[in-house]
Protein backbone atom coordinates (compact mmCIF):
# COMPACT_ATOMS: atom_id res chain seq x y z
CA UNK A 1 0.00 0.00 0.00
CA UNK A 2 2.42 2.61 -1.18
CA UNK A 3 0.37 4.75 -3.55
CA UNK A 4 -3.35 5.40 -3.73
CA UNK A 5 -5.08 7.03 -6.68
CA UNK A 6 -8.79 7.79 -6.64
CA UNK A 7 -10.57 8.03 -9.96
CA UNK A 8 -12.97 10.80 -10.92
CA UNK A 9 -15.86 8.44 -10.25
CA UNK A 10 -14.56 8.02 -6.71
CA UNK A 11 -14.95 4.28 -7.08
CA UNK A 12 -11.70 3.33 -8.76
CA UNK A 13 -8.86 2.80 -6.32
CA UNK A 14 -5.40 2.09 -7.66
CA UNK A 15 -2.86 0.55 -5.33
CA UNK A 16 0.79 0.35 -6.32
CA UNK A 17 2.34 -2.77 -4.87
CA UNK A 18 5.72 -3.88 -6.17
CA UNK A 19 6.39 -5.47 -8.41
CA UNK A 20 2.93 -4.89 -9.87
CA UNK A 21 0.00 -2.53 -9.42
CA UNK A 22 -3.72 -3.19 -9.52
CA UNK A 23 -6.91 -1.14 -9.62
CA UNK A 24 -9.98 -2.17 -7.66
CA UNK A 25 -13.43 -0.78 -6.98
CA UNK A 26 -13.94 -0.58 -3.24
UniProtKB/Swiss-Prot annotation:
This is Toxin TdII-1. It comes from the Eukaryota. Beta toxins bind voltage-independently at site-4 of sodium channels (Nav) and shift the voltage of activation toward more negative potentials thereby affecting sodium channel activation and promoting spontaneous and repetitive firing. This toxin is active against mammals and crustaceans. It is found in: Secreted. Keywords: Ion channel impairing toxin, Neurotoxin, Secreted, Toxin, Voltage-gated sodium channel impairing toxin. GO terms for cellular component: extracellular region. Expressed by the venom gland. Belongs to the long (4 C-C) scorpion toxin superfamily. Sodium channel inhibitor family. Beta subfamily. GO terms for molecular function: sodium channel regulator activity; toxin activity.
Amino acid sequence: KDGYLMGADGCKLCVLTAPYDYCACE
